[in-house]
């Protein structure tokens, strides 16, 4: 609460999950899938203790997904369906989750770097007009990740469900001219895993199966350190094969797919996306930075988001960065490589890093009125109130 007794809410709306809670807390109060479902066949039945309604959101929608047509309101970190997004926010602020009187609260929201201005304007409009929050702030996710890590300078590799960003931050300011975006993230890897399992002869078709495969991915996938070796193992042995029991009781076997799916992060051509993978993108970003800041950036690479949780990802990233540095900067001079210092931080709670940083920032700022955009300012200026964030509104 701030000095006037208003609650300060932090809401990290991810493409895949909503993480919400209060300023100063060190864990989100609620984490639930960002999905909205409508029944395929209208019926008034109950499933277990959940009643099927015309509109199901979050956890309930996820549990009953086999009977629903499921929609994700966000794609690649951008809101695509505002009506469904409002249903998601109603659920977040309503009795199911936070149960707050929004008129008497301030809210800190997060957004990916390089997000379209129109998207941000609309979010602010909805927060003030529909929910009538007394104050709103929108923070860039990568900056919050560094705050949570206690840093002001570093490069954040943030890979969630909808989008992967490489975002250098210097002295607490994100550097948009160096920020790189890769439209491959958790959801694409799940899609690719479905395709690989189809090739093995397992059929997944309904939107409900998507959630099932996501769970398989989270349980079994990893990033291979040496792809040639992994492929050899997959072809010649069965050491990689694991069994997984599906919700309907069937058992499937997953082998080489375990490392082949996340490989798309490093080799986008596997899923027909043009461009370089996450390691080369990170290398290019740091090399494009000012020569004086490069070594700082190499020493403070911070992983964030659920799609950086694969076992083996930090070591593979480090291996590829060293290889690229050796080839392109040192021109193959191995002797000099020992002077190249690199550190990749992979905090165990990186799934919720953005929320944690938001909770820290909101707590520090809760009584600083010049920090928040207020409802009164919005009524006077409309979306031009965003100038307060240091974001020019065109």
Swiss-Prot record:
- List the molecular function annotations (GO) for this entry: actin binding; ATP binding
- This protein's superkingdom? Eukaryota
Q: Which Gene3D superfamilies match?
A: 3.30.420.40, Actin, Chain A, domain 4
Pfam families cross-referenced by the UniProt entry = Actin
| Residues with the N6-acetyllysine modification | 299, 322
Gene Ontology cellular component list: Arp2/3 protein complex; cell cortex; cell projection; cytoplasm; cytosol; nucleus; site of double-strand break
Q: Where does ATP bind?
A: 160-162, 214-218, 305-310
Please list the residues that carry the modification N-acetylmethionine: 1
Q: What is its main location?
A: cytoplasm
GO BP annotation list: Arp2/3 complex-mediated actin nucleation; positive regulation of double-strand break repair via homologous recombination; positive regulation of lamellipodium assembly; positive regulation of transcription by RNA polymerase II
Q: Which SUPFAM superfamilies match?
A: Actin-like ATPase domain
> What keywords tag this UniProt record?
Acetylation, Actin-binding, ATP-binding, Cell projection, Cytoplasm, Cytoskeleton, Nucleotide-binding, Nucleus
**Which compartment or compartments is the protein found in?**
Cytoplasm, Cytoskeleton; Cell projection; Nucleus
Q: How does it assemble?
A: Component of the Arp2/3 complex composed of ACTR2/ARP2, ACTR3/ARP3, ARPC1B/p41-ARC, ARPC2/p34-ARC, ARPC3/p21-ARC, ARPC4/p20-ARC and ARPC5/p16-ARC. Interacts with AVIL.
Q: What does this protein do?
A: ATP-binding component of the Arp2/3 complex, a multiprotein complex that mediates actin polymerization upon stimulation by nucleation-promoting factor (NPF). The Arp2/3 complex mediates the formation of branched actin networks in the cytoplasm, providing the force for cell motility. Seems to contact the pointed end of the daughter actin filament. In podocytes, required for the formation of lamellipodia downstream of AVIL and PLCE1 regulation.
Q: Which family does it belong to?
A: Belongs to the actin family. ARP2 subfamily.
Task: List the protein's name.
Answer: Actin-related protein 2
